[in-house]
């Protein structure tokens, strides 16, 4: 995939959710996730499928107050991002590392790394 197309997919992905629930574009997000999409993260583990990822991201975005991109690295169809999110539940600022694999104009894989301690506490009070 050309770098410009990869860049377009990445920018569209973050645009679907980075500004919180009021501008969350669920249809746009679903349209950019490949049929063989797989998500991996510290709370959900490794899960195939668009539905569980979309619903999980939507739940997170409901708590999102702000997002600041810190760093981006790209290598062909793969990209890595480091960003901070301000969230209301659990309250605070949390750092995330996210790795995307893109092909044919769609996202095939998202791997998310973050300290899930406070999120687990909030999910199981």
Where are the language model's segments positioned?
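C-terminal and inter-domain tail/linker signature
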Residues: 1-125
């Amino acid at each position: 995939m050309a770098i410009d197309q990869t860049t377009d997919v990445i920018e569209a992905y973050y645009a679907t959710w980075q500004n919180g629930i009021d501008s969350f574009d669920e249809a746009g997000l679903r349209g950019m996730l490949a049929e063989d999409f797989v998500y991996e993260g510290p709370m959900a583990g490794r899960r195939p499928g668009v539905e569980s990822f979309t619903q999980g991201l939507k739940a997170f975005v409901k708590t999102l107050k702000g997002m600041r991109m810190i760093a981006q690295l790209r290598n062909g169809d793969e990209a890595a991002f480091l960003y901070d999110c301000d969230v209301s539940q659990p309250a605070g600022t949390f750092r995330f590392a996210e790795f995307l694999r893109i092909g044919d104009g769609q996202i095939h894989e998202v791997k998310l790394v973050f300290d899930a301690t406070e999120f687990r506490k909030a999910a199981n009070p």
